[in-house]
Amino acid sequence: MKTYAEMTAELEQLAAHNDRLTAGLRSARAQIVELKSDLERVGDPPNSYATYLRRCEGTTIDVLHHGRRLRVATAASLDLDSLTPGAELRLNESLAAVEAVPPSDAGNVVPVVEALADSRLLVAVAPDDTRVLRRAGSLTTEQLHPGDHVLVDLKSQLVLERIDRAEITDLVLEQVPDVAFDQIGGLGEQIEAIRDAVELPFLQQDLYRTYGLRPPQGVLLYGPPGCGKTMIAKAVAHELVLRSAEVRGVSVAEALENSAFLNVKGPELLNKYVGETERSIRLVFERAREKAAADHPVVIFFDEMEALFRTRGTGLSSDVETTIVPQLLAEIDGVEGLDNVIVIGASNREDMIDPAILRPGRLDVKIRVRRPNLRAGREILGLYLDDAVPVREDREELLDLAAREIYDESPASAFVRVEYSDGGSDTLHFRDFVSGATLRNIVDRAKKLAVKDQLATGEVGVAAQHLRDAITTEFVENEDMPSAAHPEDWARVSGLPGGGRRRVDAVVPLQGRTLTTPDIAGTAAAGEDGATA
């Protein structure tokens, strides 16, 4: 017979075994419940999604579901007041809207053709497929223009959002540049001519009408590279805004916001697809008309104009200019009724531009931007070596020294010998190839040398030797630049004297120069005549 202790131990073992069985049953029950829930979820009918269109009577709404327009009921938890057209909804098996979900961020990107009066949009889905779509709620108040790209859902026939395409927006800079005429040195005559051609007609419109004068439709700035053509165009836009603010009695900030400087980058506008470049030109002028219609000044600036509007029939691989040039002509002629639009073109190969563009009534005013002579060069140097730059010697004497070194006519400064087809030849010096960009680069080089010198020795300021070294380096780096392979083209782009009147047969680079100009203290002031190549 078992003792009391043995029976107690056996009971404890049975109790522990019972606890383990209970825990196992509980675990099995939980797994069974989970499996049952999974089985029920697998067996549930699938939910679907629809696009919200509009609210109807009561709690019903119209949605677009798989291409069909349905009127469905809504769950009590769905906030109908927060729904806007284009919102994405989840529908249950009974096709009742139960939840709003994040909208789709994918679809087709298409250009806007026209914004209709009733807030609908005409878009070009394909070259031969134009459709009318409705705006989603997020676009109800946004102003869209022809040429803007939008994301659309063709199934729901909705425009979802506006898309900014970098390759298109980069072609046109609409912000008016902050460049004033007093920041441009050595181009006083050209600045006066363009102000008479552009600012006067805009500011004195009534007086022009009294005399029966028509403002010029365009201005061509031509000349060698780096001589300030682009800066003049930017300054024109800036000055027009300032004068417009004075005449209209509005703030400069308001005038800047409403005016536009459409800077068209010629080479980037070219597109291999037929008609795309022409479409881009149309969009540029549409933006101009839109701004000008509100009586605000608009400048359309075509840089590197010969890249786009070359003389028709001169193309080697393709004649894209046969359609691009007529498109520009049609747009310029169409701008004749707008007093606030001016077209400015810049080119260093004006001989390649189609003559139809240059005739009176289109680009009426032609202004040649010449290379700076000695006086102009010194003025430009003074803009960059101004009072804010620390110097070791007298600033005016430093400017005189730099101008004399750059415009030296001694044999040591000979750059190239140009041989003409008539047997003649000219020896040209570095001064004949100086541009505003060259002068700025020389001053920047001198400043860098001064910085390095200050770090090494502690001496502060630009010295005469820094300028000499900068001039020498600038000229040495350009010794190999003349093109002997295509002398005629190089001569035209460089703006050589006599270019266009005599054929250039050869360009022969000469030896570099050695600066031997005496120090500041021992040198008298030089003359002020300079090359105007």
From Swiss-Prot:
It comes from the Bacteria. GO terms for molecular function: ATP binding; ATP hydrolysis activity. InterPro entries: AAA+_ATPase, AAA_ATPase_domain, ATPase_AAA_core, ATPase_AAA_CS, NA-bd_OB-fold, P-loop_NTPase, Prot_ATP_ID_OB_2nd, Prot_ATP_ID_OB_N. The gene is arc. GO terms for biological process: modification-dependent protein catabolic process; proteasomal protein catabolic process. The lineage of its organism: Bacteria, Bacillati, Actinomycetota, Actinomycetes, Micrococcales. Belongs to the AAA ATPase family. This is AAA ATPase forming ring-shaped complexes. ATP binds at G226, C227, G228, K229, T230, M231. Residues 1-42 form a coiled coil. Keywords: ATP-binding, Coiled coil, Nucleotide-binding. Homohexamer. Assembles into a hexameric ring structure. GO terms for cellular component: proteasome complex.
